[in-house]
Amino acid sequence: MISASLQQRKTRTRRSMLFVPGANAAMVSNSFIYPADALMFDLEDSVALREKDTARRMVYHALQHPLYRDIETIVRVNALDSEWGVNDLEAVVRGGADVVRLPKTDTAQDVLDIEKEILRIEKACGREPGSTGLLAAIESPLGITRAVEIAHASERLIGIALGAEDYVRNLRTERSPEGTELLFARCSILQAARSAGIQAFDTVYSDANNEAGFLQEAAHIKQLGFDGKSLINPRQIDLLHNLYAPTQKEVDHARRVVEAAEAAAREGLGVVSLNGKMVDGPVIDRARLVLSRAELSGIREE
């Protein structure tokens, strides 16, 4: 069972999730200034072995700072079977992280194992049981082949995410500007997430200085249907948010669709029509999504 608060948070907008290296004291202290939808403190790959304990303490204190109270906080912990995994979980659950990001998720059992530990810690520290969300990162061919069972493994899951660097290395290839080598993985992640009714998140774009390349990749994953993307540089936030914002033309059309649907409902009509054409449920739902994105992001700047 999950808490009512987590159930409400599962569908919140997460276009951008900004990685914050846990050992970078300046970023851990000041990342609340960035307008990302979620801040993702990292205790795993970006932290050197000798800095693991220090990073954990810094993130623990940051999670409790009042300036982070109104920001969704996600923490990528080290694998549960590593020497740091359990201590990471103790710190971030007790610290009040909204979501724990599980790295290198290969099976549903990986999710169940960390869920069991989180529940134990919630009960021990007096936190509401079921209030800590989970985000499973899939980073291997094995994980991709089991994406559906992973996505359905726990009610705590708010989404699943693609981690491309390890995945591409295991494929014995490298990342390309076109992203051809990631298409199967991206589609697998997306289909699995949607089958479970949760969100899907794309991998990072690591060349922070290549704005055109970032926008090309972001437009591609948005068209596929991803809810958002992990980011490594604050400069990518506004670029991504603008890309997810609808155009004025899209907003105008969506408003007409919703107005037609509301008029039909008031009149007790079973069929919605606009300009002589029938409008079905999925089109109406899409129109409402466009309007909600416009309310959040404004109109796209071309």
Curated annotation (Swiss-Prot):
Represents a citryl-ACP lyase. Induction: Repressed by H-NS. Part of the citCDEFXG operon. Its EC number is 4.1.3.6, 4.1.3.34. It is an enzyme of class 4 (lyase). Mg(2+) binds at residues 139, 166. Coiled coil: none annotated. The gene is citE. This is Citrate lyase subunit beta. It comes from Escherichia coli (strain K12). Keywords: Cytoplasm, Lyase, Magnesium, Metal-binding. Substrate binds at residues 76, 139. Belongs to the HpcH/HpaI aldolase family. Citrate lyase beta subunit subfamily. One of its GO terms (cellular component) is ATP-independent citrate lyase complex. It is found in: Cytoplasm. It catalyses: citrate = oxaloacetate + acetate; (3S)-citryl-CoA = oxaloacetate + acetyl-CoA. One of its GO terms (molecular function) is magnesium ion binding. Oligomer with a subunit composition of (alpha,beta,gamma)6. PANTHER family: CITRATE LYASE SUBUNIT BETA (PTHR32308:SF10), LYASE BETA SUBUNIT, PUTATIVE (AFU_ORTHOLOGUE AFUA_4G13030)-RELATED (PTHR32308). Binds 1 Mg(2+) ion per subunit. GO terms for biological process: acetyl-CoA metabolic process; citrate metabolic process; oxaloacetate metabolic process. Its cofactor is Mg(2+).
